Amino acid sequence: MRRILFIILSSALFFIGNIHAQVATSDSLVMHYLQQQGIPVTANNEVKLLMSGREKFLDLFEEIRHAKHHIHLEYFNFRNDSIANALFDLLAVKVQEGVEVRALFDAFGNWSNNKPLKKHHLKAIRDRGIEIVKFDPITFPWINHAMHRDHRKIVVIDGKIGYTGGMNIADYYITGRPKIGQWHDMHMRIEGDAVRYLQGIFLTMWNQETKQHVGGPVYFPDIPQLPDSIAEEIAIVDRTPRETPR
């Protein structure tokens, strides 16, 4: 029996599913769609599901501490709270160690949450050597491209470890919210060939928004072959804000 982890990175939604196909043939709706769209399935991956905010942030922060070359982050929003502050503190330490740090966030996602990053927050972050860029700034009084925002949640560390899932950067994924209670969401850590696709998605958006030309082999290192006993197949479907048809 073949298992494919089918990940959609959408500007409108995030969906993750485990698909257990009875027969792994082109008759499978999933395989047919992937083939039709020319979306590759990578087989050399190890996946760890992170079933709570606490699991996600403990795992993410630990891997950031071990980063050697670069850390790339792309989120709908970084809520200006204790988790985000701890994250930026840690990222600033890594900058001092010589690690490149780049972060993208959606302008509407930032504006629409109740603890946004304001101009003075962004200046303080940049003053610490962290490159942070706003995707598609809002043009008041209009909310431009309201249905085509960047809802991705991606982290790539040294081109080898990737994170994606349902959680932005906010402390309520751990503490809950007064009117809602405990927050239930999930995330995942990926090691393997699929990380190259997450990296490509991030760098395409980064270069588009900054007019930089970040790229090259150092961001796409060779990935060791994993034992068949732990290797998972992953397909990543990306919907680019303002570009990909519905």
What would you call each of these model-derived segments?
Residues N18-R246:
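Charged, low-complexity intrinsically disordered terminal segments
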Residues M1-S26:
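Bacterial Sec-dependent N-terminal signal peptides
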